[in-house]
């Protein structure tokens, strides 16, 4: 998305009331919405710097407004706007964070829950993904192989097996070791 011109949503809701499904902003989003609608799998990938998805991804998500219509729906006490067309895509969310602990992904998890992701990959201790440390590299390589298997299973089966889901959450390093690795 960084290479696409995507203006910020103005909140004018012309895409709902004046010209349903059409945004007044003229940028690359029209083509991206077309690709989004034609895709079998939608992937949202973002690092966590502070609490949630980056502004780049949030801007894209905000610009999905033309895919909604101004009719409220309720499901299990949660309210949202009705989709113009039923979602048939599977959603995949991938994120990493430099801090240890899974709590760093709570806001993102809540933000994407509405799209009911088929696969969520959250990697804490993200600084290890670029390390040259031989001890950490071995564990990172092992984890990356699991990520590849998860992707393959997602493409072929439409979901991932329980053993892959569990392996995606493998600890790369203890919090104490990671703090020492960071020099903290």
Language-model segment annotations:
Residues 56, 70-119:
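Short, glycine-/small-residue-rich phosphate/pyrophosphate-handling segment
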């Amino acid at each position: 998305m960084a290479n696409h011109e995507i203006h910020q949503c103005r909140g004018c809701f012309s895409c709902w009331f004046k010209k349903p499904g059409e945004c007044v902003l003229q940028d690359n989003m029209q083509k991206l919405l077309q690709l989004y609608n034609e895709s079998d799998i939608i992937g949202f990938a973002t690092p966590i710097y502070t609490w949630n998805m980056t502004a780049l991804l949030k801007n894209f998500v905000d610009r999905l407004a033309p895919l909604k219509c101004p009719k409220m729906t309720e499901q299990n006490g949660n309210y949202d706007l009705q989709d113009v067309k039923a979602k048939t895509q599977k959603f995949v969310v991938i994120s990493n964070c430099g801090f240890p602990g899974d709590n760093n992904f709570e806001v993102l998890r809540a933000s994407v829950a509405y799209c009911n992701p088929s696969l969520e990959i959250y990697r804490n201790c993200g600084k290890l993904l670029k390390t040259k440390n031989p001890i950490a590299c071995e564990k990172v390589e092992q984890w990356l192989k699991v990520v590849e298997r998860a992707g393959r299973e997602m493409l072929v089966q439409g979901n991932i097996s329980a053993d892959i889901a569990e392996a995606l959450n493998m600890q790369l390093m203890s919090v104490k070791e990671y703090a020492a690795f960071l020099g903290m």
